[in-house]
């Protein structure tokens, strides 16, 4: 039986309104709910809590010491028997997709870029199912690391200061 579990990641980004010497932070709210799943995410905690995205200036420069925020996604399928196929899909092919790694926020000049935390050489494609039932993703017996690093990115040269949000649909499929 194929089970598809839709989830939604919410991201919030802040832009520095004046100078890089002024600082402010904004939380990144993320939540996932799984029902009747044979696999559990982050030890049944799902993904919740706040994650702070790096601050960027209106000229598009990241002014934080860390250039990305890691969103942990550890999928544990040890309690559910055999898992023949395990896929995760971030986003879709909607107009919110800028390219294979970048998603728009509520400001069309500001996007969020995604990459795999575990292996940066693995291609990340929004709207494409990624088979993570492979040794490269393995953390332990039937435990897989699908964590992503999220970076704010200015699409054009400058962006107006303010707070912007984005919602990224995520689907976990297991057979």
From Swiss-Prot:
Any GO BP annotation: cell adhesion
Keywords for the protein's UniProt record, in alphabetical order: Disulfide bond, Fimbrium, Plasmid, Signal
InterPro entries in UniProt: Adhesion_dom_fimbrial_sf (IPR036937)
GO cellular component, one term: pilus
Subcellular location: Fimbrium
UniProt keyword annotation of Disulfide bond present: yes
Site (described: Required for stability and transport): 174
Coiled-coil residue windows: none
Record carries keyword Zinc-finger: no
Functional description taken from the UniProt entry: Involved in the biosynthesis of K99 fimbriae.
Name of this chain's protein: Protein FanH
Species of the source: Escherichia coli
Higher taxonomy: Bacteria, Pseudomonadati, Pseudomonadota, Gammaproteobacteria, Enterobacterales
């Amino acid at each position: 039986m194929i089970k598809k579990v839709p989830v939604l990641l919410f991201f919030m980004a802040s832009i520095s309104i004046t100078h890089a010497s002024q600082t402010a932070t904004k939380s990144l709210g993320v939540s996932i709910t799984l029902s009747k799943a044979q696999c559990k995410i982050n030890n049944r905690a799902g993904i919740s809590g706040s994650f702070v995205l790096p601050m960027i200036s209106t000229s598009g420069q990241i002014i934080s010491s860390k250039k990305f925020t890691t969103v942990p996604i550890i999928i544990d399928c040890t309690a559910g028997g055999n898992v023949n196929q395990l896929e995760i899909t971030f986003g879709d092919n909607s107009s919110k997709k800028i390219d294979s790694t970048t998603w728009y926020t509520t400001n069309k000049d500001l996007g969020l870029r995604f990459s795999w935390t575990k292996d940066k050489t693995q291609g990340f494609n929004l709207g494409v199912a990624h088979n993570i039932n492979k040794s490269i993703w393995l953390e332990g017996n039937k435990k897989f690391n699908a964590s992503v690093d999220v970076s704010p990115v200015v699409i054009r040269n400058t962006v107006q200061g303010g707070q912007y949000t984005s919602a990224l649909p995520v689907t976990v499929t297991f057979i």
